[in-house]
């Protein structure tokens, strides 16, 4: 099935201007256009847009996604390089996750500390 930008935007839950921005930034290298120059999206395009949104939430750099798009245009021979970009980003995410887990433990300890404090106050009143 094919979609114009308004329909595609509704499907992926983004405003059309965001999708246009992604294309301008080189993140959507395979978007086709109809005879009038309107963007045409297929299911694969929508899946990639959804992936971009997910990847951006992880903090990946636009430049890395742009590079992946450029490499994708070059074909399957660039799969190893694309995989390496994702592996590098995964490593950074795992390090960040360790930091977040440590911070979460500290927050949980503080919550427990304050719950104990509240409990002691209630028991003494």
Spans of model-derived segments:
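Glycine-centered, phosphate/nucleic-acid-interacting loop/turn motifs that mediate DNA/RNA or nucleotide
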Residues: 26
């Amino acid at each position: 099935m094919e979609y114009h930008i308004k329909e595609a935007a509704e499907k992926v839950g983004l405003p059309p201007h965001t999708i246009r921005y992604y294309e301008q930034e080189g993140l959507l290298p395979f978007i086709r256009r109809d005879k009038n120059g309107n963007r045409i999206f297929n299911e694969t395009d929508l899946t990639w847009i959804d992936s971009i949104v997910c990847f951006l939430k992880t903090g990946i750099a636009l430049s890395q996604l742009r590079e992946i798009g450029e490499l994708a245009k070059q074909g399957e021979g660039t799969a190893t390089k694309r995989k390496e970009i994702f592996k590098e980003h995964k490593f950074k995410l795992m390090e960040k996750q360790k930091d977040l887990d440590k911070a979460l433990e500290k927050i949980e300890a503080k919550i427990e500390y304050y719950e104990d404090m509240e409990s002691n106050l209630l028991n003494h009143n």
